[in-house]
């Protein structure tokens, strides 16, 4: 069975997902698209053929009988309504982050999905599908470094757009670490604090950059995450786990070391698309396979809710300067697998 997918949102990430379904993935095809920008819809249809039907709205696309599953890649504040509509129709839905713009919105989706009685939602957190993170998790699970005690992370971008704000360092950038570290350590967060080093001269006047986020898990693991979004030199994601008997560091992406002109160098990537392109392929293939096999296993609505709760605490800590406590709710049995 070829899964028939409708895509809501034909911007950069939506078009990229359509491309990978045609060029890279198997078991699915795009049968419907919609976007508030009609030109973007026309571009998708021109590039990928006349068999794709255009719809005037997301709800109309979701209700269409030929659409068996939905991809939500539209503007973030529209996500909650669209995901709830897909659940109401009993249709599996892959939703790019954010699942909802508030933790309360994520919880409403959790409740709707549980009331439906079957997992329908996969959230677009791609890092658990990255080969480097997976290798690091295998080392932790093997016991080779003993119990994790500390984690040192960095999330560095060369630059950001003018509209990027201090809060977005949490809600747009750190949110990926907040998700993947729960998965990596199999632990929940207990507290968060944000401290500000000397400010880079490359940051816009309204932006505090860099920032250091200090997290503690329920199990007592201490985590520090450097968020530096104007580092200039490249896109650089680092993660090192310090255990009782050893240290494990996530490998950098494979690149050809170069010796030339009396220098030894290794190239560094410049954007997130390059760094996680393979992970995007794997996560979307996992969604397709999960729908066809009637068992979704990727990042869930509950994972999105947990990340949103942690993000709220971090945003509060940005302004308070204090250690902000989090009450980690237990994962519902519905999401334990």
Swiss-Prot record:
Outline what the protein does.
Answer: Involved in the oxidation of myo-inositol (MI) to 2-keto-myo-inositol (2KMI or 2-inosose).
Reaction catalysed by this chain? Answer: myo-inositol + NAD(+) = scyllo-inosose + NADH + H(+)
Subunit-level organization: Homotetramer.
> PANTHER family this protein is in?
INOSITOL 2-DEHYDROGENASE, PTHR43593
Q: Which GO terms describe its biological process?
A: inositol catabolic process
MF-aspect GO terms: inositol 2-dehydrogenase (NAD+) activity; nucleotide binding
Identify the keywords attached in UniProt to this record, alphabetized: NAD, Oxidoreductase
The protein here is known as Inositol 2-dehydrogenase
Enumerate the InterPro entries for this protein: Gfo-Idh-MocA_inositol_DH, Gfo/Idh/MocA-like_OxRdtase_C, Gfo/Idh/MocA-like_OxRdtase_N, MI/DCI_dehydrogenase, NAD(P)-bd_dom_sf
Enzyme Commission number(s) of this protein: 1.1.1.18
User: What protein family does this chain belong to?
Assistant: Belongs to the Gfo/Idh/MocA family.
User: To which species is this protein native?
Assistant: Delftia acidovorans (strain DSM 14801 / SPH-1)
Keyword check for NAD, yes or no.
Answer: yes
């Amino acid at each position: 069975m070829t899964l028939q997918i409708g895509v809501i949102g034909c911007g950069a990430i939506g078009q990229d997902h359509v491309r990978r379904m045609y060029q890279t993935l198997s078991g699915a095809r795009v049968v419907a698209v919609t976007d508030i920008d009609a030109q973007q819809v026309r571009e998708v249809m021109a590039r990928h053929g006349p068999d794709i039907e255009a719809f005037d709205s997301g709800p109309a696309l979701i209700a269409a009988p030929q659409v068996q599953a939905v991809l939500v890649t539209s503007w973030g504040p529209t996500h909650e309504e669209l995901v709830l509509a897909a659940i109401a129709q009993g249709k599996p839905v892959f939703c790019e982050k954010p699942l909802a713009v508030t933790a309360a919105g994520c919880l409403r989706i959790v409740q709707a999905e549980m009331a439906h009685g079957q997992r329908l939602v996969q959230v677009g957190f791609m890092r658990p599908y990255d080969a480097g993170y997976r290798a690091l998790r295998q080392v932790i699970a093997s016991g080779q470094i003993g119990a994790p005690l500390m984690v040192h992370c960095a999330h560095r971008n060369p630059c950001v757009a003018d509209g990027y704000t201090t809060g977005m360092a949490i809600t747009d950038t750190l949110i990926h670490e907040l998700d993947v570290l729960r998965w990596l350590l199999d632990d929940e967060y207990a507290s968060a604090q944000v401290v500000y080093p000397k400010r880079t001269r490359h940051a816009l006047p309204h932006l505090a950059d860099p920032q250091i986020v200090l997290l503690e898990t329920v199990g007592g693991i201490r985590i520090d995450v450097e968020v530096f979004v104007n580092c200039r030199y490249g896109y650089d994601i680092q993660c090192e786990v310090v255990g009782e008997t050893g240290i494990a560091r996530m490998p950098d992406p494979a690149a050809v070391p170069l010796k030339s002109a009396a220098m030894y160098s290794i190239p560094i990537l410049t954007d997130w698309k390059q760094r996680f392109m393979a992970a995007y392929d794997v996560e979307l293939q996992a969604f397709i396979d999960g729908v066809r096999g009637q068992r979704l296993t990727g990042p869930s609505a509950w994972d999105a809710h947990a990340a949103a709760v942690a993000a709220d605490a971090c945003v509060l800590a940005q302004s308070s300067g204090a250690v902000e406590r989090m009450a980690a709710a237990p994962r519902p049995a519905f999401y334990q697998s």
